[in-house]
Structures are given as C-alpha cells and as structure tokens.
Amino acid sequence: MNKNKKIVVGMSGGVDSSVTALLLKQQGYDVVGLFMRNWEYGIKGSQCPNRIEFEDAKKVGALIGIEVRGKDFVKEYRDRVFDVFLEGLKQGLTPNPDILCNKEIKFNVFLNEAKSMGADMIATGHYAKIAKYKDHFVLDTPKDNTKDQSYFLHALSSEQLSHAMFPLGDLTKKEVREIARAHNLPVSDKKDSTGICFIGNQKFDEFITQHLQAIPGDILDENGKVIGKHKGLVCYTLGQRKGIGLGGIKGNESENNTHKPWFVASKDVVNNTLTIVQDTNHPLLMSKTVEASHMHWVLEEAPKVGDKLMAQVRYRQQKQACTVVEANEEKVVVEFDNPQRAVTLGQSLVLYSGDYCLGGGFISFYK
C-alpha cells in the first residue's frame, strides 16, 4: 500500500533519524535519506563534524537498504539562521537558532528539495506528533514527554506539517535505542547531540566573540553599584550562573561563610551594563506577565482573552498554566499562575491548549 509513496528522511547520522528511516522502510515506503550540510566545516570556530555524521548516515543507509544523499544548504542556513541569530545577539536578545532552522531550513528549503526529488512527504527524527484540530494540522504531544520537541517546531505552519511525518512520536527514547540495537545499527549507542550545532564543544563566549565584537562594560548589583567588569553583553544570557567571572562580595556570604553565587538578571544594551543578583529566585529573576510578538498561530487565529492555556518559555520546561490577557495576530500577553524564572528576550513563548501546540512568538517584554 505504501510502495508508491516516496518519503525523504532528513538523516543527521544520529540514532533518531536512523530509526526513523528504518521504520518507514519496514512499513513499505520508498525511502531516500537526505543529509543536510548546513554549516561550512572550517568556518571560524566551527566544530560541526559534517563529514563524520554523513559517513554514519551512509553506513546506516547501506545496512537498511536505502540511498543516502548529501545536500549543501550552507548559504541558506547562513542567510536565514546564523545571520539572524547574530543580529539578535547584537540587540541584546537570546534567539534560538533551532527554531529558525526548523522553520527556514528543514521544513522549507529541505522540503522543497525533497519535492524536487519526487517525494510525497518528508520525515525527521523529532519527538512530536501531528494531529488534525479544527481543520488544521497541528503539533501534538509525543509519547516521550521528556523529549517533547514541539517547542522547537512551534513556528511550522499547518501547510508545512501536512507534508511531514514524525515516526518517533509514539516511541520513547529508550525504545528507539532498543530498536536500533535490535537491528545492529552502528549508531545505536551514539550520544545525542546537545547545544547549538555550530558551536560544538566550545564555550559560547569563545565562539561568539569570533563573529561579534564584545565590548566590555560595568557589572552592576541590584542597587546600581558597579562591582566588576563584563566581557561584552553578547557573552551572557539571563539566569546565567557560570562564567560571570565575579567571586563573592564581602558581606554577602551565606551562613556557612561561603560566597553566594551570582546570576545574570538583566542586560542594558544602551548603557552596556550587566546587572547581576545573588539568590536563584531573586525577585529580579522572576516574572508573571510575558508578552510575545511576531506571533505564529497554527490555527491562523489568536486565542481569546481569558483563555486558560499552558505555556513554555524555554525548551524542556514543564508546561506552565497561564491566562491570556491580550491577543491578536501579531502579539500575545499572558499572565502565569506562578512566577517564571529568567524569562529571556528573544526566546520563544509557546502556547498549548491541552496537548495541542497553538503556536508562539518571540518574547518582547516581561515583568
């Protein structure tokens, strides 16, 4: 029944995309693997091991009996993801390149490439599900809540989702690895990739300062007193604890006379100052009201004022209850039942109705 349906699988050389290809092959689809080369190996600070990952993908393809091709999307990734990421950092924001990559590359230029290859659908190893809700294709919560990637996929349109498959949506990560081992896939025990692809194992600030100018400035305490110097605002994000480069201040020791850790509370781009506080739940780190702009609504309509929804302000955060205070096509304001820690400008606020993802936008204000 599926023999005439051609599926192009985005293969990364990891266990998730490999098992995705295997499952679809077993289901009788005409499967072709396509490895995306999104980053130029050797670009300043780059640590993306493209060649190794491509070889792993081809080994899996040979084992399960599918062709695996490679395609260069370096220019598109640079223009639509990396440059946008850098511009956001310059403005004092903390953009998420994975969200941009899914919207602009994997489910856009990759999808178009797959169509040119005669594909009926594309498939990836994301942990998510697709459902029909109010005549639209929407993201649904996967079986493995700990791996739920709908946060990264929230900017996809119903049209994009109509051409996509997520075969791992009904599996746990443990089950995926068990399937890989049972079929002797060479990547069955390969570690999951973490962090931002193009940064690799480097420290964030070491990589970023190769691409953006870091201008040192004053570090302030909550009262506005200068207590140190920062390396450049592009090197920090809200809630950050490590790498601030400031020890304890006399008079702020804890009961056992050890210095309390510092946390980044805010960045002032205009004055080039970094405000830090002590106490992981300091009031300056907590917010109940969050505004997001540049909204993408999967249902093509905003929720209503007063709607009770669930939301995430970062990946892997447990979904939090909130109430819609204001909403239109471009903007939404929600008030959380409980204060949220380290809400960050430029990150995404993603909203859910039950298990369905309604969409999201870039955080533009919080208090």
Curated annotation (Swiss-Prot):
GO cellular component: cytoplasm
Disulfide bond sites: C101-C197
Active site, per annotation: C101 (nucleophile), C197 (cysteine persulfide intermediate)
A Pfam family the protein falls into: tRNA_Me_trans_M
Annotated catalysed reactions: S-sulfanyl-L-cysteinyl-[protein] + uridine(34) in tRNA + AH2 + ATP = 2-thiouridine(34) in tRNA + L-cysteinyl-[protein] + A + AMP + diphosphate + H(+)
Family of the protein in this entry: Belongs to the MnmA/TRMU family.
Name used for this protein in its record: tRNA-specific 2-thiouridylase MnmA 2
Name of the encoding gene: mnmA2
